[in-house]
Amino acid sequence: MTEANSNRNRSKHARSHYGREELRTVRSVKRRTGGKNNYSKFTPMDNNESIVEESEDEGEEEDDEQEDPQPSSMAYDALLTLLDDESDHEQFHAEKEKALKKLEEEQEREEEELQEEDEDEDEEDEEINLEDFESDDESHDDPFHFHFNEEESIDRMINEYESSGLKVKMDRKVNHNGYNILEYLPSTSRCLNEVKTLDKLRIKKKLRDQFSSLDFKDELDKKLTLDIFNYKNINYQYYTRETDYQSLYLLHALNHLLKTRDRIFDHNNKISADPNLEFKDQGYTRPKILILLPTRNFCFNLMNKLIKLADIKTVENKKRFNTQFYSDFKIETLNGNKPKDFNEFFRGNSSDFFTLGVKFTRKSMKIYSMLKQSDIIFASPLGLKMLLDKEKNDYLSSIEVTILDKADGLLMQNWDHVKQIFTKSLIQAPKNFEELNCDFSRIRMWCINDQAKYVHQVLSFSKYTTPELNNIVKAPNLQGYALYKPIIDDTNNVMNQLNYQLFQSRIINKNIRLNHMFMRFPSSSPMESPKKRLNFFTKVILPNVLTKSPYTSGTLVYISSYLDYIQVKKHLSESRSEFLAVDEYTSLSASSKNRSLFEKGKYPIMLYTERMHFYKRYNLNGVRNVVFYNLPTDPDFYAQVVRQIVRNKLKDEELDLNLCSIKVMFDRFDTLKLEKIVGLKRASLLVNAEQEVFEFK
C-alpha cells in the first residue's frame, strides 16, 4: 500500500514523539561517496519462484469479529490446482502470472478498504509518562550503547576498517559441546567492547524474568546467547541439536526495542527541560527488526512465542492473525511415510507469501500495523520482495537487526529474493527524503553517512550451512561474526548412520553391501565448476553407467542445481540419449507417467531435481543405481535418495545390492556438503588427496 504523506499536524506530532519538534540544521555531516554495500557480493542461487498466497501485509486494524474467508485464498487454491493440471512449462508460467496478477488486484482492493490510518488512534498510546519507561545509564559495558551510540569510537573504527580494505581476521576458534565456533573480527587496532558473562548483560527489567527462565543447557547455549546480545553476526547450524534459539533472538529483539524506545523518551524529557540539548538516537524510519521466515506456519508459531515473551495482555488483531496464519492441517495424515523434516516444513499453513508489521505501544501489541509504523516486520522473502517492487518504500532503511530463521527453507524457495532484499532495500539510504517523517537533527551520524552496514546485525539459523548463508553473515559488522559448525565425525556423518541403520535392519551385512563411490573432478574455481562438472559427467560417468554397470537401467541422476539440470537435459536431448526427467515444473500427470516408465525399465536414466525431492519426497520404484551430479544441499537428502535402492530391494528379492552403485561427483569446492555426508576428516582427505576416486562399502 503506497504510503501517503501525512498532514503537517500529524508530522509534527510524530516528530515530537520521536524527536524534537523543530527541524534543525544537521552539523558535522560527513556523507561518504563510494563505499558500496558489501551485500552486492552475494552469490545468486538458481532456485525458482514458488506459488504464492494472498497477504494483507499493510492492512489496518479491523474488528476481530469480522473474519470472513478471504477471496484470495480461493485464488491460491486455484493456483495449486493449476500446478497439478498444467501440461507444459509455458502454460504453467502463463497461468501462474495470471493468478499472481489476480492476487495483486485483490490485495489492492483490500488495502483500499483498510486505509484508515492509525496515527490518530495511537497518539494516546504513544504519550508516555516518566513512570512508563526504564532509563538506562549509558554504560560502556552495555552492548547496545557501545555498538550503536558511542559515535566517536564507532567513527574511528569505521575509518580504520575501511582503510584496511574491510579485511577480517580470525580471532579465535573454540569448541563447545560438539561445535566448532569460528570467530572473526575486523582488522583494526582496537575493537568494540564485549560482555563476557551472562550476568553482565544489561537486560531490561521487563524481560529479566523471561531471560532468567531460559534453559541454558551447556556452554554452547551460553556462548550463543552472549554472541547474540553482543550484536555479532551469527550463522548457527542447529542440525540435529534441540535448542530454543528462537527465544534467545526474540528476547534480544525485544531488549533492543525497549532500549531504543526508552532512550528516545529519556532524551525527549531532557530536551523538554533544556531545549538546547542535542541527541543522536534515531534512524530514518521506525522499523528496527526484520525477521524472514519461509512459511506462514513458522510465522504463526514465532508470533505466539513473541506474545508470550513480551508478556503483553492486549494483542490487537490476534483473531484475524490466527484466521489468516493458522491451519490445523497435518500433512502426515495424507502420507505417513514422509520424513520428519518434510512434515514439519509443510505442516499447517505453508503459504510462502506474507508481510506483516508488529508495533508495540504503551499497553498493547498490535499485529497488522502499517509497516512504516512497525517495530518488527515479519515476512517471507517472496512477500516482501513483491511488496518492495510495488511500493518502492524506505521502511527497511533503518533496520538494525535482521534475522533469517529456517534459512535452509529460504534456500529451497528462491534465494534470489533474499539477495535482492539485502542489496536493494535493506539499510539503503532513503530514495525520497521529502517523504520521511523524522527529525533529521536526531539521526545518528553513521546512518546519515551511509555507514549503517557497520552496525547492522545479521542472525542466520538453519539446519545446515551453505556458501550463501556464510556470505550473508560476513557483512562488515564492527562486532565481527561467528560461524557455529557442528563437528561431524566418523560416528555421526550421514553415510555411516545410514549404513548402521541398514546393518541393524539386516539389509546389509558382511557379504551384502552398498558401494558408495566418490569421484573428484578437477576444477580451478567455483565459476569454472559447472562446465567441468558437465564435462566429467558426459565423458566419464554417463558412459560408465550405460555400458559398464551391471544394471544398465534404473539409474537415477540427482541434480541439486536447476541450471545444471537444464544443461544435462539439453546435452542428453542433443545426443539423442534415452532418458526421462522430473522437476518442480513437471505436471502431475507427466510426473506420474515418467515415474511409471522408469519403474518398468523403458528408459535407462531419469533426471531428478533437488527441489522436486524437497517438495514431493517421492518413493521412486525401479531405482538400481544413483548418480549424485551434485552433492545434496541438505545432507539428509543423501540418505533419502540412497534408500530408494533399498526400497526396491525389499520389493524385488532378485535385486543384488552388491551390483548396485552410488556414484557421487564432487570437486574441491564442495567441502561444506561433503563434511555432513562423510565427516570432517574424510572430507578433507577426499578434497586434498592425490587420488581422485574413493570407494566406501
Swiss-Prot record:
Residues 1-128 are annotated as: Disordered. GO terms for molecular function: rRNA binding; U3 snoRNA binding. It is found in: Nucleus, Nucleolus. GO terms for biological process: maturation of SSU-rRNA from tricistronic rRNA transcript (SSU-rRNA, 5.8S rRNA, LSU-rRNA). It comes from the Eukaryota. GO terms for cellular component: nucleolus; small-subunit processome. SUPFAM superfamilies: P-loop containing nucleoside triphosphate hydrolases. Residues 35-50 have a biased composition (Polar residues). The keyword Cytoplasm does not apply. Residues 51-68, 105-128 have a biased composition (Acidic residues). Residues 89-104 have a biased composition (Basic and acidic residues). Signal peptide: none annotated. Belongs to the UTP25 family. Component of the ribosomal small subunit (SSU) processome composed of at least 40 protein subunits and snoRNA U3. DEAD-box RNA helicase-like protein required for pre-18S rRNA processing, specifically at sites A0, A1, and A2. This is U3 small nucleolar RNA-associated protein 25. It comes from Komagataella phaffii (strain GS115 / ATCC 20864) (Yeast).
